[in-house]
Curated annotation (Swiss-Prot):
Enzyme Commission code(s) on record: 2.7.7.6
Any GO CC annotation of this UniProt entry: DNA-directed RNA polymerase complex
Annotated source species: Haloquadratum walsbyi (strain DSM 16790 / HBSQ001)
Location(s) in or outside the cell: Cytoplasm
Taxonomic placement: Archaea, Methanobacteriati, Methanobacteriota, Stenosarchaea group, Halobacteria
Family matches, as Pfam families: RNA_pol_N
PANTHER family: DNA-DIRECTED RNA POLYMERASES I, II, AND III SUBUNIT RPABC5, DNA-DIRECTED RNA POLYMERASES I, II, AND III SUBUNIT RPABC5 FAMILY MEMBER
Binding sites annotated in the UniProt record for Zn(2+): 7, 10, 45-46
Name of the protein described by the UniProt record: DNA-directed RNA polymerase subunit Rpo10
Length: 64
């Protein structure tokens, strides 16, 4: 599904950083930890949300 707007644990807004993180870390060759540092995501709970998220909207869409 889509990235949550806020971290489930602390409530910090993380959704606004998803596109840049995906572009730089997943599609590019940058280290995900350094990208998260550059984006200002310091808490381990927020970092977990960004690193472990998988876009499943294309997989689920045919069943709706």
């Amino acid at each position: 599904m889509m990235i949550p707007v806020r971290c489930f644990t602390c409530g910090t807004v993380i959704g606004e950083h998803w596109d840049e993180f995906k572009q730089r870390a997943r599609d590019g060759n940058e280290d995900p930890g350094e990208v998260l540092d550059d984006l200002g995501i310091k808490r381990h709970c927020c970092r977990r949300m960004m690193v472990s998220h998988r876009d499943l909207v294309d997989v689920v869409a045919p069943y709706q």
